[in-house]
């Protein structure tokens, strides 16, 4: 058997029957909150991959609407990804200092800066409606970022037959996930775009995807999914040859016509040499994004940023100000596409732009 066939066999053996029914290739389209859509997930699943929706920070009501849309498209239920970050701790003085850093940008837009901040959404365990939704709708595949929810939630999902995935950035985190009964571990390398899943109490060791996969394949009995910097067929085959049971690809799917990526995001990815950087300046947690003016201005003072996701509230207010200025046809707003959080991994700009189903085929050739 080829490395691809071996990987597919291992992955199919670990997932819910509803996923196994359509899974023909060991590839996961990454969740990517704000970018992944039911249409993108449906296209990936139609091509035999696992389609995903990032719903961290999304209400149960909105998630139910997304699942209804999946059904309207005639698609199986997508893999849903949730955030399980520590409960945000307010720090009024710190929040005010951060708002002072952003005030010049609000002034450019002619919109007052907020005078206070609060967490824009709760963590998974603080929103019991999320677990109720997953159990009621029997979602077949769920993943968690920034760690795991309470053990009671893991057990309840297991009794319902849900396949559980979670991300690890080092061997100790993987050990924690395996001990909790996680079915599949996503090995998130340093190259990955978007939020870093690191939840260990020790400093981040910044392991590359290749090194992390090598370590986890030897350590773990469950399937390991490689994630980070995977932008072409050679990258895919390298990871499968190392023993990964699949790959998770995100950045390559952002320019797909089925995604919800903004025009500025698509244009930035089309740059001749897109540059990415790990920064906590958008949300308060490290996340890899395309370098733009916001990163250049705020990353040098990121030590002052409030806790995640309170910092996110400040950036959301800034982007609302951009939209407000644009709605009023303020010429200043036209120059502020460089303030957005344009998530991307180190493989940015290295994949062809094509519909999602075609991209799955190209990656797995």
Q: Model-found features: residue ranges?
A:
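Active-site entrance/lid segments in N-terminal catalytic domains of soluble metabolic enzymes
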Residues: 2-219
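Conserved active-site-proximal phosphate/metal-binding subdomains
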Residues: 195-225, 230-365
